[in-house]
Amino acid sequence: MRLHESLSPIVHVLSLSCFFLSVSLAHERALFSGTLNDSETIVSSFRTFRFGFFSPVNSTNRYAGIWYNSIPVQTVIWVANKDTPINDSSGVISISEDGNLVVTDGQRRVLWSTNVSTRASANSTVAELLESGNLVLKDANTDAYLWESFKYPTDSWLPNMLVGTNARTGGGNITITSWTNPSDPSPGSYTAALVLAPYPELFIFNNNDNNATVWRSGPWNGLMFNGLPDVYPGLFLYRFKVNDDTNGSATMSYANDSTLRHLYLDYRGFAIRRDWSEARRNWTLGSQVPATECDIYSRCGQYTTCNPRKNPHCSCIKGFRPRNLIEWNNGNWSGGCIRKLPLQCERQNNKGSADRFLKLQRMKMPDFARRSEASEPECFMTCLQSCSCIAFAHGLGYGCMIWNRSLVDSQVLSASGMDLSIRLAHSEFKTQDRRPILIGTSLAGGIFVVATCVLLARRIVMKKRAKKKGTDAEQIFKRVEALAGGSREKLKELPLFEFQVLATATDNFSLSNKLGQGGFGPVYKGMLLEGQEIAVKRLSQASGQGLEELVTEVVVISKLQHRNLVKLFGCCIAGEERMLVYEFMPKKSLDFYIFDPREAKLLDWNTRFEIINGICRGLLYLHRDSRLRIIHRDLKASNILLDENLIPKISDFGLARIFPGNEDEANTRRVVGTYGYMAPEYAMGGLFSEKSDVFSLGVILLEIISGRRNSHSTLLAHVWSIWNEGEINGMVDPEIFDQLFEKEIRKCVHIALLCVQDAANDRPSVSTVCMMLSSEVADIPEPKQPAFMPRNVGLEAEFSESIALKASINNVTITDVSGR
């Protein structure tokens, strides 16, 4: 009796606890058959996933979707009304009268529906969120699935979700499609899909480029994809099958499910697997494809191999040569290679030895293979006896692979891979032939004779030029001598172009070849007779850049050799004409991309971060690592050119100043540069140093990150205001914002603010900037308020601003703030 009495309070408390727990669990339900308004959700049985309404980052639109419930970072894995957002909180998720799951807005318009043809009623169907993340609509009486979200994925691939085609799906193709951007879940530019014939392969396609292939996994052999040799069964793909009816599906599972992982196709076309870190309370990058340049589909063109561990990555297969040698040497490998010698089987006569095969090891198999079940010896004979066969391979699970068309997308792998045998003419294997030695000797002698003739001809031409140009040529060489230390020998390698040569190259400076208008005159695209593409800057007489600026640029650039500096090919002096000839930059200038919403999407964050690093490396070379110490004085987005691979190159050295080794700063009465990029001590006092270039660098960094121009320093004020609020989302270009890179973006904003501080001494050197960018744990000081240019700084500054108002659109350089 006493025992019963003593336990009664405990039993009572436990009963109440169970009651409230049951109420709580009832509220956190996994299924529903009625309605969910904007503030209501359902959660999976073990609380891994939640379904309801959400808003993406930097957006107020409302979408019905599924996201991870147990982590603080919003990570959406499926969206219902991805094309039809709701702009307020009036949305409702419900079971309609015909038994379908629907999303409606405040006016009861159906924005999305499962659209299942069923005779079920609203009372006989229920929606349930499974612990797998699969949202299902099922018959309440039989539990049969009528519809499931796993058959209609958006950008995420979850464990046990099928990708491909299968009898279960009614023959439909199940693909993964990226979001448009982090703020817009509507279908984006990229799709990942499983392609079955002749071998199952995973592909990423660019929807905006006629479904062009971006990446392929290589063929599947029953255990792994050939192009993903480091991915072993269990870690990435758990099972895969091809059904008898030629429909197939891939399903993925992780070997260790103790760590939360998310595999998705991001809006830039990368398939990314990220892992949740409890220590960091954020996602960390696990792996991604494409991971290297060689992963990009057909990066090197046909008949090539791509090796990410070599520089350059691309090389022609033995027996082949570049299709366009000039383009190839300039790093444009898209044209690929062509065969050096015809195959014996292609010759009209049968004289000569039979073709042979070159074996390449550890290869990712090229695209477009044909499949055969022949044995390895039979595979070899089949290829040898067919002149249309250009390569073959044989491997466990693959059988015999035959190629009858160009070999594209071949890659040298670090591990695993297969042997690929390439058909070549027999003469390609003659290593003991003495003819190469004889040819080499003759060639060397020929080169010597030609070189001698060229030198003699050059001397004669130079003498004729001197007579023809008279005063102009002599004048420029006198200036060159003064700047180059009194020796013309230092500039002998820099050619002087004839005016007619450049006129012909640019089609008489036609408008169709005009690339743009700089502060010193128009720039034209041209092509020399030997096929070299060039950019010609034709200096206008009204530009203010006279002989001094031209000579400065000739001297400065001719002495500099760096990956991130534009290359100068030569110049032209003819009467009143002054022209500079540069290497042609096919991707134009940085401002063309970051300030144009249509082009900005081409530069994702990884690309922009590489551009930032490249600019810093180029500037570090100017300030510290070159033979001369050079202050650029006109560093801005329009003076950062991009080559074919989007590698940045600093250009326009007409305003540069060469510093003696024992000087740190200088003063000038002639303030030159571009408003918005000029440091305050330079704009108002004419004092310039390395730190004035650092200020310009900071402005460029903020423009790259924000996608906005620094007009009248308003960008600096805007960024500083948001920075003080502890957020960066409002200052970052939506095209690049991704929580995956938020830490790195924040660090770059931090560094940029240090670069634009008011006092030059507070700004870091470029070497310090490079160190902070490359360091993960750098102790970066807190920035002070940046320099906001005041309005009333005297007549000269007002004149400077008036020029800048006109120049802000065209990026015209201010050449003199004291009127001419």
From Swiss-Prot:
Main location: membrane
UniProt-annotated glycosylation sites, renumbered to this chain: N37, N58, N87, N115, N123, N173, N211, N247, N256, N282, N332, N404
Residue ranges occupied by any Bulb-type lectin domain in the UniProt entry: 27-150
Residue intervals passing through the bilayer: 437-457
Gene3D superfamilies: Bulb-type lectin domain, Phosphorylase Kinase, domain 1, Transferase(Phosphotransferase) domain 1
Cytoplasmic side: 458-820
Reaction catalyzed: L-seryl-[protein] + ATP = O-phospho-L-seryl-[protein] + ADP + H(+); L-threonyl-[protein] + ATP = O-phospho-L-threonyl-[protein] + ADP + H(+)
Domain called Protein kinase: residue spans: 509-788
Entry's family note: Belongs to the protein kinase superfamily. Ser/Thr protein kinase family.
Protein name according to UniProt: G-type lectin S-receptor-like serine/threonine-protein kinase At1g11303
